[in-house]
């Protein structure tokens, strides 16, 4: 990837949602909700505390994470639809 996030920002690729319901009904693209789960693609170096010391992020590339429905900024990088968000927008890491 030709993009490196700064500070406490991360780049996330959304994981696609289900194509069918449990009952077998196919969900059209227009009715699908945006997935709130994604994979971390790249992370910034971290934020700075009050004394100016660098604080590394708790997440790393490859982590699967949950985030809020309206979190982040949607961007297209190298032909991929991605999100750029602050680490604080991430709700947690999926084990």
Swiss-Prot record:
One Gene Ontology cellular component: cytoplasm
Xref: InterPro entries: Chaperonin_GroES, Chaperonin_GroES_sf, Chaprnonin_Cpn10_CS, GroES-like_sf
GO biological process assignments: chaperone cofactor-dependent protein refolding
UniProt keyword list: Chaperone, Cytoplasm
SUPFAM superfamilies per UniProt: GroES-like
Compartment(s): Cytoplasm
Source superkingdom: Bacteria
Gene Ontology molecular function terms on file: ATP binding; metal ion binding; protein folding chaperone; protein-folding chaperone binding; unfolded protein binding
Main location: cytoplasm
Subunit and partners: Heptamer of 7 subunits arranged in a ring. Interacts with the chaperonin GroEL.
Role of this protein: Together with the chaperonin GroEL, plays an essential role in assisting protein folding. The GroEL-GroES system forms a nano-cage that allows encapsulation of the non-native substrate proteins and provides a physical environment optimized to promote and accelerate protein folding. GroES binds to the apical surface of the GroEL ring, thereby capping the opening of the GroEL channel.
Similarity section: Belongs to the GroES chaperonin family.
Stored NCBIfam families: PRK00364.1-2, PRK00364.1-5, PRK00364.2-2, PRK00364.2-4, PRK00364.2-5
Protein name: Co-chaperonin GroES
Gene that this polypeptide is encoded by: groES
